[in-house]
A protein has these predicted regions:
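Beta-strand-enriched cores of mature, soluble protein domains
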Residues: 2-159
């Protein structure tokens, strides 16, 4: 069997997404950490915020805790790599650690491309399902209305 026959005999799975949460995350002023071989480094403090479950996850809501940070690298090609680490505290008291690795590209594009892979570490049984799914993120600025970003976490499923 050649590769074309093999690929035709195994139909591709479809990927769907479901909105798990939307977060409004207040951020501090960007700090310049200097140049590195990978690019210009920055640090953006996370000051806090709120998150709200998507339509199918109404019981998933709470606060974004202050104390996290977004480490950024501005590469020589103009693309930004962001690595944010912070905690969210659900209204039931559970603490959920979020690692959000974002790629931002606005070079010659009409709209800014800002998508991520979000790793969730939840200890509770109520939100343990977040540990077992791939979560795709989107990132949008809330400026000038608020010195914040809007992060949405989308659960990726296969059909």
């Amino acid at each position: 069997m050649n590769h074309d026959e093999l690929l035709n005999s195994v139909p591709p799975m479809t990927v769907t997404t479901t909105l798990a949460w939307s977060a409004i995350i207040k951020v501090g002023e960007r700090q310049n950490l200097g140049q590195s071989p990978a690019g210009q480094r920055f640090l953006v403090p996370i000051l806090g915020g709120n998150f709200y479950g998507g339509p199918q996850f109404k019981n998933f809501h709470g606060k974004v805790l202050p104390g996290g940070a977004d480490r950024q690298i501005l590469r020589s090609d103009g693309v930004k790599e962001l690595d944010a680490l912070y905690e969210m505290k659900a209204d039931n008291g559970d603490i959920i650690t979020i690692q959000n690795q974002v790629l931002v590209d606005q070079n010659g594009l009409d709209e800014r491309y800002a998508m991520s892979v979000i790793k969730v570490m939840a200890a509770s049984t109520e939100f343990n399902w977040l540990n077992r799914r791939l979560i795709i993120g989107t990132l949008q600025s809330a400026r000038p209305r608020l010195n914040a970003v809007i992060v949405r976490g989308w659960i990726a499923d296969q059909k």
